[in-house]
Amino acid sequence: MKATIIFLLLAQVSWAGPFQQRGLFDFMLEDEASGIGPEDRAPDMPDLELLGPVCPFRCQCHLRVVQCSDLGLDKVPKDLPPDTTLLDLQNNKITEIKDGDFKNLKNLHTLILVNNKISKISPGAFTPLLKLERLYLSKNHLKELPEKMPKTLQELRAHENEITKVRKAVFNGLNQMIVVELGTNPLKSSGIENGAFQGMKKLSYIRIADTNITTIPQGLPPSLTELHLEGNKITKVDASSLKGLNNLAKLGLSFNSISAVDNGTLANTPHLRELHLDNNKLIRVPGGLAEHKYIQVVYLHNNNISAVGSNDFCPPGYNTKKASYSGVSLFSNPVQYWEIQPSTFRCVYVRSAIQLGNYK
């Protein structure tokens, strides 16, 4: 009888599947549960590579996303999984990005370093990131943009830093770049090198808002579709500053000190659809609106406009070749709404699209 029981037990063991160790932490926990100490274990340790990548201490890892945000880290964690595609390090206390911090992260697509204390980035820190597309550096202490950014980069956001210079060299070879965000930096016009953005052939969106620039940056790429320069100290819009921007669809110049827009400026942006010039010091409606074929939204509220001509917005008669306006704002200007001829807005899509009001 005893022999029969032993035989059945041996058979059951032989039918069981092979033991599979799930991870290093499982291995350690099983030791604790069983009371087995190092002296009781065979001297051969498991190959760590077979156990798979280990998530950095206190971070969370899931589906090639490594989240190490809000941990009070003062440096980039070591031994990041090499298959990581998104690394989130925001809201920490990192002060410096060093060479080797991102070694072996050849598959990283997105790097989030927002809201740290970074003041220095080594020139070769991003060199290993051969597939990086999105780099978020906002809310740090950078005085310049990093050098040798990956040529695969498509989106760079570095607002709310201490950047005073934008050199053309930092963007050399970045032919895939689409979005550049540099708002809320102590930038001056003299700090932006002429043609700094010109080499980026696919650049579509630039935002340099809430800085100290007094002019529109020169040498902007013709691929640009949106230009946001709100909240600066620009005093005038020269026709030459927008020359060649044939694809520009949205121009944001709100909250500046603009008193004049040169004649011919709008002719240099033939596909413009939205023009934001509210909260400036304009004394008249910019010229060229009536002749512009595609423009549909014009914000001119909170200016010093004292008169509006009957042909300021629409061409004489009813020109069906011009797109109808879907939004025109003129409130908070000295001009009284009853002084404006009803025919002035003959090319507006609906009357509700017109915003008029008394001057305060």
Swiss-Prot record:
Q: Would you list which residues are glycosylated?
A: 34, 212, 263, 304
Any one GO molecular function term: glycosaminoglycan binding
- Where mainly located? secreted
Q: Which GO terms describe its biological process?
A: negative regulation of angiogenesis; negative regulation of endothelial cell migration; negative regulation of vascular endothelial growth factor signaling pathway; positive regulation of macroautophagy; positive regulation of mitochondrial depolarization; positive regulation of mitochondrial fission; positive regulation of phosphatidylinositol 3-kinase/protein kinase B signal transduction; positive regulation of transcription by RNA polymerase II
Q: Where in the cell is it found?
A: Secreted, Extracellular space, Extracellular matrix; Secreted
Which terms are listed as keywords in the entry? Answer: Disulfide bond, Extracellular matrix, Glycoprotein, Leucine-rich repeat, Proteoglycan, Repeat, Secreted, Signal
- Placement of LRR repeats on the sequence: 74-94, 95-118, 119-142, 143-163, 164-187, 188-213, 214-234, 235-258, 259-282, 283-305, 306-335, 336-360
UniProt keyword Disulfide bond present: yes
InterPro entries tied to this protein: Leu-rich_rpt, Leu-rich_rpt_typical-subtyp, LRR_dom_sf, LRRNT, SLRP, SLRP_I_decor/aspor/byglycan
Q: Which domain of life is it from?
A: Eukaryota
**A GO-annotated cellular component:** extracellular space
Protein's UniProt keywords contain Secreted = yes
Share the record's PTM remark: The attached glycosaminoglycan chain can be either chondroitin sulfate or dermatan sulfate depending upon the tissue of origin.
| Cysteine pairs bridged by disulfides in the record | 55-61, 59-68, 314-347
Q: Which residues form the propeptide?
A: 17-30
- The region annotated as signal peptide is 1-16
Chain's role: May affect the rate of fibrils formation.
Summarize the subunit comment.
Answer: Binds to type I and type II collagen, fibronectin and TGF-beta. Forms a ternary complex with MFAP2 and ELN. Interacts with DPT.
Family, per the entry?
Answer: Belongs to the small leucine-rich proteoglycan (SLRP) family. SLRP class I subfamily.
The name on file for this protein is: Decorin
Organism whose genome encodes this protein: Canis lupus familiaris
* Gene field: DCN
